[in-house]
Regions:
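Conserved C-terminal guanine-recognition region of P-loop GTPase G domains, centered on the G4
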Residues: 166-181
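Motif I (Walker A/P-loop) of helicase-class P-loop NTPases
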Residues: 55-59, 166-167
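P-loop/Walker-type NTP enzyme "switch/lid" segment
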Residues: 34-36, 42-52, 59-132, 136, ...
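Extreme N-terminal, non-catalytic leader segments
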Residues: 1-46
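Inter-motif core of Ras-like GTPase G domains
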Residues: 141-160
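Structural beta-sheet core signal
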Residues: 75-76, 132, 154, 189-191
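Beta-strand-loop-alpha "switch" segments that mediate conformational coupling across diverse proteins
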Residues: 193-236
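NTP-binding/hydrolysis catalytic cores, primarily Walker-type P-loop NTPases
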Residues: 232-270
Length: 270
């Protein structure tokens, strides 16, 4: 096991990130294309724990990336049966840039097949980006979709009641990857709903030593985003707020390490 310690300095705050990787090559799994060779990127937003802000991050990140990459295809796929992300983003999206494919505990062959086809098509498109929002709960029926994605984005609060199931969720992903001999999807944990004054993320960094994951820049002030939830007008509507700056910072982190392929290169060298 090779452990890489990465330090990201952001707005004079230093966040300790742990990136753990096995010294292995990229392999193919059943019905899976080698993601490192693909131009498109897919980001799976998930956590077994509910109420950690998955849909909020998914919609704001989608809207930020659409603004950042006006000429690229940025699609939102909402698989959460509640359909929150779909309802928020539908007024701001073209018909071909958003889909609602609810996948619950019961197997839905039509939705699964459709989702599989859309993901593979997007991954084959040059410079496309796909955000997949999911409901709370175990990977269940969507684990194959998670394994197709470049990255799993896992939001969590700093409370132990959220951290413990979050670590269990990542361990399940690690087990799946070990079973198939792959390192994708990379796991990025987002400290979410943190106190604006919080500077010490040692508790989360220590918890991540148990798993193969890195820590992204934190997000605070989600109360601002929630206040816009019922009347969602996109990233521009929260312009000038701390939340806006933090979403932008997270978006640039995703661009630098996921969309650019830098995480793929780091894992290749490990």
């Amino acid at each position: 096991m090779v452990l890489l310690h990465c330090i990201f300095a952001i707005n004079s705050k230093t966040i300790l990130c742990f990136l753990a990787s096995k010294c292995s090559s990229f392999f193919s799994i059943s019905r899976r294309v080698g993601l490192i060779m693909q131009s498109g990127k897919a980001i799976f937003v998930g956590n077994i724990k509910g109420g950690v802000g998955k849909s909020t991050l998914a919609v704001y990140l989608t809207d930020y990336l659409r603004e950042r990459y006006a000429t690229r295809s940025v699609m939102l796929l909402d698989t959460d049966p509640q359909g929150t992300a779909f309802e928020m983003m539908r007024p701001l999206s073209r018909a071909d840039d958003i889909r609602f494919l609810p996948i619950g505990d019961r197997y839905d062959g039509v939705s699964m097949t459709t989702l599989d086809g859309i993901l593979r098509r997007m991954l084959s498109q040059d410079e496309s980006v796909t955000i997949v929002d999911t409901g709370a709960g175990k990977l269940g029926n969507v684990w194959q979709m998670a394994m197709l994605c470049s990255t799993v984005l896992v939001p969590t609060s700093m409370s132990w009641t959220d951290l413990r199931p979050t670590i269990d969720f990542i361990k399940e992903l690690d087990d799946r990857k070990e079973d198939y001999g792959v390192v994708n999807p990379h796991v990025i944990v987002v400290p979410n709903r943190t106190s604006p004054s919080q500077k010490n993320f040692g508790q989360l960094a220590e918890a991540l030593e148990e798993v193969n994951a890195i820590m992204a820049p934190p997000i605070s002030d989600l109360s601002i985003a929630r206040s816009h939830g019922r009347d969602f007008h996109g990233f521009d509507a929260v312009s000038g707020t701390r939340f806006s700056e933090e979403i932008k910072r997270l978006g640039e982190f995703i661009i630098d390490y996921v969309i650019s392929g830098e995480l793929d290169r780091i894992y290749q060298r490990a």
